[in-house]
Swiss-Prot record:
Membrane protein topology class: Peripheral membrane protein
Protein name per its UniProtKB record: Mitochondrial distribution and morphology protein 12
Entry similarity comment: Belongs to the MDM12 family.
Any single biological process term in GO: protein insertion into mitochondrial outer membrane
Ranges of compositional bias, category Basic and acidic residues: 83-101
Gene name of the record: MDM12
GO cellular component: endoplasmic reticulum membrane; ERMES complex
GO-annotated molecular function: lipid binding
Region (Disordered): 75-101, 209-251
Localization annotation: Mitochondrion outer membrane; Endoplasmic reticulum membrane
One Pfam family per UniProt: MMM1
Keywords associated with the record: Endoplasmic reticulum, Lipid transport, Lipid-binding, Membrane, Mitochondrion, Mitochondrion outer membrane, Transport
Length: 388
């Protein structure tokens, strides 16, 4: 089955659409050439002009079949790269939502839930030692008298715990004539359990003399209960709302076409690059090089496969033994059989100085490089994949 292609639609009747298509192809080619590997003596390659020409290709459909498994198996690396990009995007979105959930008007404030037995100032640990505090401040007086005043027993109506500060040796055990210290005020913090501060301190002890209470009740140990971040910050959703849903498979069924292409083209393609001399140092000398491709002759058997599940197109060239060109010229290299003719015009040097035109050795070298690249990149088992 043969296909008739109206090649003239690429240039007529709307020339503006043709210009837009040419510009998009130039941008695509420049992006691919920027990432492509090139020899050390070839500088950056840039496409400056592109024209489809007037001669169209002859295309024959040889077969339609199922997609080769090798295309999907060989594209696993691309799948892993896409999945990794998607996971990275999801992680960034979750981090963004988590940071937004933790923002509040109290940013910069630091609150700590302190146990009722610990000090309210400083970070030093606290251990209740009433005898140590009494003798530290009034040791000589009470050792002479041989007894403790009633105000230092737990039976005192206004009994309070002694608070030992690391920055001062003063004891804060209240005397009978002292004014009672202000009650401990804990700022209102989201997630704070009111039951931790609602009970009075004296409720933890019986109203008994010091000699009995000190020997019977164990000494409380300091405990700090930090506020858990999980109690105040909501957990992020399993799938962020900002991420687009995963694309469903295409409704177009998967298929594979075997095509025979014969194209004597008169397209025009202009490239700019440079010849670099890296001796005795890197970029020791560079000569501007302008290449203009004015036509080529391509004869190839092409396999084009479409994967509806992944929405991708795979393209490769096969060396079919049934091809007439293969039977006639078995001794000709594959690259030369595929690309039998490539017309190139070259210019070396600066336009405002001395210019060498149509240098045969340079042109033949470029043709050999193009043929080798065509075989290494597109001839099966190598293939090119386009993600739609």
């Amino acid at each position: 089955m043969s296909l008739d292609i109206n090649w003239s639609l690429l240039s007529q009747p709307d020339e503006s659409a043709t210009d837009q298509l040419s510009e998009s192809l130039i941008a695509l080619l420049n992006a691919q050439l920027a990432e492509a590997h090139r020899p050390s003596f070839i500088g950056p390659i840039t496409v400056t002009a592109f024209d489809f020409g007037n001669a169209g290709p002859d295309l024959e459909v040889k077969d339609i079949r199922d997609v080769w498994r090798v295309f999907d198996q060989g594209d696993d690396e691309g799948d892993f790269a896409e999945e990794e990009k998607q996971r990275e995007k999801e992680r960034e979105e979750r981090d963004k939502l988590r940071n937004e959930a933790l923002k509040s008007s109290l940013d910069g404030e630091r609150y700590e839930l302190v146990d009722r037995y610990s000090s309210t100032e400083g970070t030093s640990s606290f251990e209740y030692q009433p005898e140590y505090d009494i003798h530290e401040q009034h040791g000589d007086d009470y050792r002479i008298r041989g007894r403790r005043p009633l105000s230092y027993t737990f039976g005192y109506p206004h009994d309070r715990l002694a608070v030992h500060r690391s920055s001062s040796s003063r004891s804060f055990i209240p005397f009978p004539f002292d004014h009672p210290p202000p009650a401990l005020h804990i700022p209102s913090t989201p997630g704070l359990n009111p039951s931790l501060v609602s009970h009075p301190i004296s409720a933890r002890f019986s109203r008994r003399p010091m000699s009995i209470a000190a020997s019977a009740a164990p000494r409380p140990t300091p405990r700090r209960r930090p506020i858990e971040p999980s109690s105040t910050s909501p957990s992020p959703p399993a799938h962020p709302a900002g991420l687009p849903p995963k694309a469903s498979s295409s409704s177009i069924p998967s298929l594979q076409l075997h095509l025979r292409l014969s194209h004597a083209s008169d397209l025009h393609l202009t490239l700019l690059t440079s010849l670099q001399v890296n001796y005795p140092s890197a970029l020791f000398m560079a000569l501007p090089l302008k290449l203009s491709i004015t036509g080529f002759q391509l004869n190839a058997d092409i396999v084009m496969a479409y994967s509806g599940e992944k929405n991708r197109v795979h393209l490769t060239i096969v060396d079919d033994e049934s091809n007439p060109a293969h039977k006639e010229d078995k001794q000709i290299p594959l690259g030369q059989r595929l690309l039998s003719n490539l017309q190139i015009e070259s210019e070396i040097g600066h336009a405002d100085a001395h210019v060498l035109r149509n240098v045969g050795k340079v042109e033949r070298f470029i043709v050999d490089v193009v043929r080798k690249t065509l075989v290494d990149e597109l001839v099966f088992p190598n293939f090119h994949t386009v993600a739609l």
